[in-house]
Amino acid sequence: MELSFSSKDLEFRDEVRDFLANEYPKHVKEKLDNGEPLSKEDIVDWHKSLSAKGWMGFNWPVEYGGTGWSPAQIYIFQNELGLAGCPPLIPFGVSMVGPVIYSFGNQEQKDRFLPDILNFDTWWCQGYSEPGSGSDLASLKTKAEPVSENGKDYYIINGSKTWTTLAQHADWIFCLVRTDSSGKKQEGISFLLIDMNSPGIEVKPIITIDGDHEVNSVFFTDVKVPAENLIGEEGKGWTYAKFLLAHERFGIAGVGASKRQLERLKEISKDLGDE
């Protein structure tokens, strides 16, 4: 079995390295090299540099604006970014909800949401875990009740989510909600897209043991969400959630970054005289 990269793959690797040498935002690199935290604006600048190159949809098919890269090219891309010490890509749009939308959403939803994900004009967060519903995710209780007003259909959302990463920056949240409690717990879950600026949403920080603010609690009190923001069929959210998790694990593997940190540990070990 031939496991080495092809000449085409090596050319692509060189293209990625050239991009990082010339188009990786210098102020972002300098901050990371100096151990300084990145602002929201820094993170957006980094992602927009990838968007300008046409690489934001690195794992998307061409028909939806992606690169259509091979698995080898995707590996090379992620590996080179990690080895160069680039900020991790925010996965919630491009690696999580984006594939759900282009796989299960209707055409109007694809037209509305996918371009903003590719341009990083919309920052997404993930509304899965709840207090008491983490590993047993299907036990979630955040409720969505259907209502009609002036000829339009909505869901009224009440409940909360927790450990919501970077919700303090997010414009939208993709959210698992309970639309039916009569059957098996997996059967009554639906997948909604919710504007984080909707009245009734409150984000509270969770400060972790290292003093960092990365995760949050998100509270929903009578939040009105247009029914057109439902992905796929009502009650099929568990299927879409599992599909998303497969993309999530792939998107956050961090192989290149792990290699870089391993090399750093080797250097530290040598400096300490540990052979």
What are these regions (language model features)?
Residues 201-275:
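Glycine-rich beta->alpha junctions and the first turn(s) of the following alpha-helix
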Residues 133-136, 155:
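Hydrophobic, small-residue-rich alpha-helical packing segments that form membrane-like cores
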